[in-house]
Amino acid sequence: MTKFVFVTGGVVSSLGKGIASASLAAILESRGLKVTLIKLDPYINVDPGTMSPFQHGEVFVTDDGAETDLDLGHYERFIETRMKKTNNFTTGRIYQSVLEKERRGDYLGKTVQVIPHVTNEIQEYVKRGAGIGTGDAVDVAIVEIGGTVGDIESLPFLEAVRQMSLRMGPNNSAFVHLTYLPYIAAAGELKTKPTQHTVQKLREIGIQPDALLCRADRRIPDEERGKISLFTNVAEWGVISMWDVDTIYKVPRMLHEQGLDGLICDKLRLNTPPTSLKRWDQLVYETEHPQGEVTIAMVGKYVDLSDSYKSVNEALRHAGMKNHVRVKIEHVDSETIAPGDAAEKLAKYDAILVPGGFGARGVEGKICTARYAREQRVPYLGICLGMQVATIEYARHVAGLANANSTEFDAATPHPVIALITEWKDADGTIQTRSETSDLGGTMRLGAQSSDVASGTLAHEIYGNIVTERHRHRYEANVNYLDRLRKAGLVISALTQREQLTEIVELPREVHPWFIGVQFHPEFKSTPWDGHPLFNAFIKAAIDHQKSRQPTLPAAAAS
């Protein structure tokens, strides 16, 4: 029978529920349990696909084409289980499903209400995410409830999991509450009152937490833990201190050493082998003992919020660990780069990465960046839009296609080398069609798809014969211009197997040591254990470029 751990948050948002949930999952997985995670988001958007990165951060894409919360990226990086569409749902998705049932007459004329109809629907979605009733059922499902206790948006979710816990009976569910202890410098102490109040609010709803994860900028003294225990009715050994650390990969060890996994296993009556966190310890060792450092310019337009590129940042760090170097990432606003000052802005970097994005703002700066990297032989990795701007730049300045552009940015361009995809096969095999008037939400080419890779190319060195990666885009390289680009020297090194859409472009090795653009999003498949072959190769190229720029010492004069 699948057991459930429900993770809630209080006081303030952005405390790290996703990392805490993923860390607990990683510890339980190390005990030999099959674990999954489910994220419940209380906003009314059907999914985060149309939300601004400044509002929501990165949109993480699963193999089966779901546009999901960025926490699912943490989940996949921490445990072996791959996330699916069923691992993330929102208030909007729930209400959409309830209303569709009402229109079909499934409720037999009853008045549709939050209780029981919405709360029952939430419970059904949670069970679906845990694989209950299928061959994919897990031992433990950790359910993270977004938002903070006290928010009106979260109430249906909290009521649903309270009912679910009651229906499952004792020892089949546990509640973990993440809270915040502010440090008041003037008083020189951590304050427990906000934690007392948030637990009181949770108990008013009918939920008694089994463990408290207490976030602070320092360790919580035993005296304060005892005080929290007394006023929250949580056993003192269930009051867990979570202090700030320099890498998120230290969190599993932190939680294990304070007995969180033991507490959960006792509560759920799980008889498991001992925890083994050796590979996590090795990971931390790699991060703390680099043999060098490279600096990467990430040129984009969402640079004011690092969560906008969360998976790219993590993939670069993973590749750094595989290459035994620390990767320093500097975000460069593409709107600040113009043709005359690209060298001034970019010359100091060991490699350049242009990530995905949407809209015309900052695009010309990205095109200038691609040109600088091409002409100065700086390692360049373009992801999604980063591949498209590299193609536009090459068309303009090498292939002689003046004013070439994407129809996303200039509908009247004389040379639309990038254009809207009108038909393709989706991740589940269905044929999708789109036009300029299609809705924005859920209408992109999404999910994992395979492509053939040309032999003798850089892409083939990295991937082999076949590449399978996740996609999230509406625009593609225009097939009508591929021959002209090839004749001008651009290498089209991977094409989709059915539609022959461009997946990878690169420059010949005799022209540039390492220049590649990919239409997909490789960052979504990077893990701290193996990195990702494309990012690993990119960081290796950055190391080589750094070495090539170092002055060589003159040979010692003969004596």
From Swiss-Prot:
Signal peptide: none annotated. InterPro entries: Class_I_gatase-like (IPR029062), CTP_synthase (IPR004468), CTP_synthase_N (IPR017456), GATASE (IPR017926), GATase1_CTP_Synthase (IPR033828), P-loop_NTPase (IPR027417). One of its GO terms (molecular function) is CTP synthase activity. Keywords: ATP-binding, Glutamine amidotransferase, Ligase, Magnesium, Metal-binding, Nucleotide-binding, Pyrimidine biosynthesis. Residues 295-548 form the Glutamine amidotransferase type-1 domain. It catalyses: UTP + L-glutamine + ATP + H2O = CTP + L-glutamate + ADP + phosphate + 2 H(+); L-glutamine + H2O = L-glutamate + NH4(+); UTP + NH4(+) + ATP = CTP + ADP + phosphate + 2 H(+). CTP binds at S13, D151, I152, E153, K191, T192, K193, P194, T195, Q196, K227. It holds the Pfam family GATase. Gene3D superfamilies: 3.40.50.880, P-loop containing nucleotide triphosphate hydrolases (3.40.50.300). Residues 1-270 are annotated as: Amidoligase domain. Allosterically activated by GTP, when glutamine is the substrate; GTP has no effect on the reaction when ammonia is the substrate. The allosteric effector GTP functions by stabilizing the protein conformation that binds the tetrahedral intermediate(s) formed during glutamine hydrolysis. Inhibited by the product CTP, via allosteric rather than competitive inhibition. ATP binds at S14, L15, G16, K17, G18, I19, D71. L-glutamine binds at G357, L385, G386, M387, Q388, E408, R474. It is an enzyme of class 6 (ligase). The active site is at C384 (nucleophile), H521, E523. Homotetramer. CTPSs have evolved a hybrid strategy for distinguishing between UTP and CTP. The overlapping regions of the product feedback inhibitory and substrate sites recognize a common feature in both compounds, the triphosphate moiety. To differentiate isosteric substrate and product pyrimidine rings, an additional pocket far from the expected kinase/ligase catalytic site, specifically recognizes the cytosine and ribose portions of the product inhibitor. Belongs to the CTP synthase family. This is CTP synthase. It comes from Paracidovorax citrulli (strain AAC00-1) (Acidovorax citrulli).
